[in-house]
């Protein structure tokens, strides 16, 4: 069994891969104040509930965009599994050529997604990850990571509107039927959600043009992350949603880097 750990700004996703399939996955809150002991208790409870034996874990790989949580998580791995985890970062074998000005600046999550997308599709691609931040990444047919862009996630946009506009309430991110709304809540929902979809469509259109100007074929657009399906249902610029893209990338990177 391989334990895959994807640390995001809001949630930590853990997956267990065994015999070419996923046998368990969990989502817990990211909390940099938790100690390694607290994470150890939580992870062991998850294993017990799933009736999994931690001694059968052969290896662990961690991808994180939250640096100050890594000490606790790495110690948790050592305590629970008596192994050193592979950590996605500078020096790791990826199989892709990162064309960033400073490759060390590329977030681990973006590298992991790019590896999975390229291994699976082997074509020019735009990868959109709808997380706390929304990231757009461009990959060539040869596997060059050209770069991309980062913008606030949908929830951040909603929170900012609530926090900075005194008379506007905090709202649930639900899709209204119309963009011509007759109350404050649905007006905010329409502006946030449909406005966000418009932003995605424009960025994808612009990225496609820039990639094709470089001689690439029209890129395939792959989306992942918690709100990917919401956006996918309202636009035709996304070709596919892959909710397990990051875990797939971690599994591929583990195989490339295990001793």
Curated annotation (Swiss-Prot):
Task: Quote the subunit structure annotation.
Answer: Homodimer.
- From the Swiss-Prot or TrEMBL record, give the protein name: Type III pantothenate kinase
Q: Which family does it belong to?
A: Belongs to the type III pantothenate kinase family.
Q: Name one GO biological process term.
A: coenzyme A biosynthetic process
Instruction: Give the gene name.
Output: coaX
Which EC number(s) does UniProt give? Answer: 2.7.1.33
Of the GO CC terms on this record, one is: cytoplasm
UniProt organism field:
Clostridium perfringens (strain SM101 / Type A)
Organism ancestry: Bacteria, Bacillati, Bacillota, Clostridia, Eubacteriales
HAMAP family documented for this protein: Pantothen_kinase_3
